[in-house]
């Protein structure tokens, strides 16, 4: 058991997805959110952040709303950090159907000498599959109050540990390499369903 919390950001309906809730898109018979919950099962606590908590009753998890709604993923992370019981929280977006248990467990077991542990994949930081220290919530709140809600910009206000290598990644199924892929548009989702791979 990983003595950290995990939070799934299920912000709601996306305009680029024709206002469908991406958490309830299906891939291989499971909702995206079901696949993510399974990947996070070794974390001591799993919560969901959503402004529509009634939609998630079937999963038996605690659901919390944004404290500062309408300000994007930074608001969701801030809410998660205010509600978790542990000192660290893995944050995952609900539109990442290939989140892999080995990858998130590897992140969860890295020594806690950081405020933010953030993967870098294909030259891009991945703040929506990253671990945040609970104490980050105070600076995040100041940013939200000032309507300065850019997530990456806010991340640079903290001591970040960047993870660029996953030692096991070449030895396992290629789905691990897709871990950070997210589905944003109707076309991307239709392509996913047609090809069954990315």
From Swiss-Prot:
It catalyses: Mo-molybdopterin + GTP + H(+) = Mo-molybdopterin guanine dinucleotide + diphosphate. Its EC number is 2.7.7.77. It is found in: Cytoplasm. The keyword Transferase applies. Transfers a GMP moiety from GTP to Mo-molybdopterin (Mo-MPT) cofactor (Moco or molybdenum cofactor) to form Mo-molybdopterin guanine dinucleotide (Mo-MGD) cofactor. GO terms for biological process: Mo-molybdopterin cofactor biosynthetic process. Keywords: Cytoplasm, GTP-binding, Magnesium, Metal-binding, Molybdenum cofactor biosynthesis, Nucleotide-binding, Transferase. Mg(2+) binds at residue 95. Its cofactor is Mg(2+). Belongs to the MobA family. PANTHER family: MOLYBDENUM COFACTOR GUANYLYLTRANSFERASE. The gene is mobA. The N-terminal domain determines nucleotide recognition and specific binding, while the C-terminal domain determines the specific binding to the target protein. Pfam families: NTP_transf_3. This is Probable molybdenum cofactor guanylyltransferase. One of its GO terms (molecular function) is metal ion binding. GO terms for cellular component: cytoplasm. The keyword Disulfide bond does not apply. It comes from Clostridium perfringens (strain ATCC 13124 / DSM 756 / JCM 1290 / NCIMB 6125 / NCTC 8237 / Type A). InterPro entries: MobA-like_NTP_Trfase, Molybde_CF_guanTrfase, Nucleotide-diphossugar_trans. GTP binds at residues 9-11, 22, 66, 95.
């Amino acid at each position: 058991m990983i003595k950290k919390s995990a939070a799934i950001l299920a912000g709601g309906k996306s305009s680029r997805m024709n206002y469908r809730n991406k958490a309830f898109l299906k891939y291989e018979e499971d909702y995206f959110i079901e696949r993510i919950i399974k990947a996070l099962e070794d974390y001591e606590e799993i919560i969901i952040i959503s402004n529509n908590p009634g939609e998630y009753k079937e999963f038996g998890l605690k659901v919390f709303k944004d404290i500062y709604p309408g300000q994007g993923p930074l608001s969701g992370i801030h809410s998660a950090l205010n509600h978790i019981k542990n000192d660290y929280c893995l944050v995952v977006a609900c539109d990442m159907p290939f989140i892999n248990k080995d990858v998130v467990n590897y992140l969860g077991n890295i020594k806690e000498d950081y405020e933010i542990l953030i993967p870098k994949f294909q030259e891009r930081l991945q703040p929506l599959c990253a671990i945040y220290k609970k104490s980050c919530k105070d600076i995040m709140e100041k940013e939200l109050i000032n309507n300065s809600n850019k997530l990456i910009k806010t991340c640079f206000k903290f001591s970040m540990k960047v993870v660029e290598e996953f030692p096991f990644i070449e030895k396992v199924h290629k789905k691990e390499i897709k871990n950070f892929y997210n589905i944003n548009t109707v076309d991307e989702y239709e392509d996913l369903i047609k090809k069954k791979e990315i």
